[in-house]
Amino acid sequence: MRDLDNLKEMIARHEGYEPRVYKCTNGYDTIGYGFAIKDLYMDKEVSDLILDQKIQQMLKRILSHEDWGEWFPGKPQAIKEVLIDMIFQIGFSGVRKFRKTIQYIKDDNFLMAG
């Protein structure tokens, strides 16, 4: 498979890598090593791998946050799952706007938080 490795290195070197969507010279939305989004298909296996990675990134961010890192680990699993789902949907900064709800959760007043 050495030939495949060489080919991969050559394409990567020539194409370059862009982690965000951009317009290629032909005007197509493109990402990564010049992958035109219109031609991409993401199967469930790849989607699951990306979701696993996103969840790990969210947990790392939560646990490294100066406030959340202190109280989040001690909450019931169901509460943590709801918060992670909210973060996935609207982002960490979006969830942090729910100041009263977060305070209720910190105080273990889950009825008021809901």
Where are the predicted features?
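Acidic, aromatic-lined catalytic clefts of primarily extracellular/periplasmic carbohydrate-active enzymes
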Residues: M1-G114
